[in-house]
Amino acid sequence: MKRPLACAGFLYLVIQLLAAFLPPAAFGPLAAVFLAAVFPAWKLGGRFRTHAVLACTVTGAALLLRMAAFTWMMAPIQARAGTQAEIHAAVVETSPGFLEDTVRAGVLVDEVNGMAVRPFRVYFLSLPQALPGECFSARVEFAELEENEYTYGNYADGIFLAGEYLDGFLPQGESGALWARAKRVQAALSMALRKVLAQPYAGAAAAMTAGDRALLTDEVKDAFRGAGLSHVLVVSGLHLSAVGGLVYAAVRRMGRRRLACACAMFSSLAFMCLTGFTPSVVRAGTAMLLLYGGALFNRKSDALTSLGLAALLLCLQNPYAAVDVSLLLSFSATLGVLWVTAEHRRWRAGSAAQGKNAAR
């Protein structure tokens, strides 16, 4: 089989997408059916036995992992809906609130009523002014997420619960986690841009260069959306490719090819961390790591394999990432570009061969 890793990654993505429309009770039985079909597929598959075994194995494993994610990740969090609690949390991301001195925020809760819990994310429509990376304590009420066009996007971000702020907001310093430090670097870059540019230009520039969308206003978002350019406000593979390419070119001038590859890989990882591992950046980052990693060890990278691996990595860390519209559009567009490129090369090769035959 050609490109087994790519096939496994794309199949895993498709299965997790389809699983979003299945009742949770169906995950276990369906997983058992597909895993039980592995041996018959190997015995009766004939020339396609490898494909059949891979399909059954990946499908069964994907459904098992989806069942585990629902049982141990999603259900316990959603069970808190309707309860009030004193929480300790760190702000992950913010956007301007509807009222003065408030923000809409996604927070990471690590303590409930004074007891440490497995961290989980909650979305607040209104929270007192806070910055990403800052910790706070407050009394809140948990609630179920509203069923709307943003529901699957919240699931893809690991948010399964909404929160309503009640009272007692008290800042608790800054988080020392890696993601929080990356957020502070983002904030520093945004502050530097704010000193040079006025709003709304500073917010748009920060979103396009550092992935910091905190300064984006609804008017700017609506304007870009109306022009069909909302994707420009998101850090994408273009930015990552430019950073990695510039680092590689700068170090390569010293005559150290392997050192240049290693530096480009490090810069790609650092940029992925800075932008919060968004789907488009992870997809491009995986491709860049395979490209420079292959060059580092004198191996040739493959675009489809890197794309399939990126899909697998994104959905392994959160199976609900498969329902993210931006992820699906990003992968679909990349697959389309790869297919058109391959067809164009095949057409050029055929035209060149016909030209040589005609010349004879």
What residue spans do the PLM features occupy?
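Beta-strand/loop nucleic-acid-binding surfaces
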Residues: 114-130
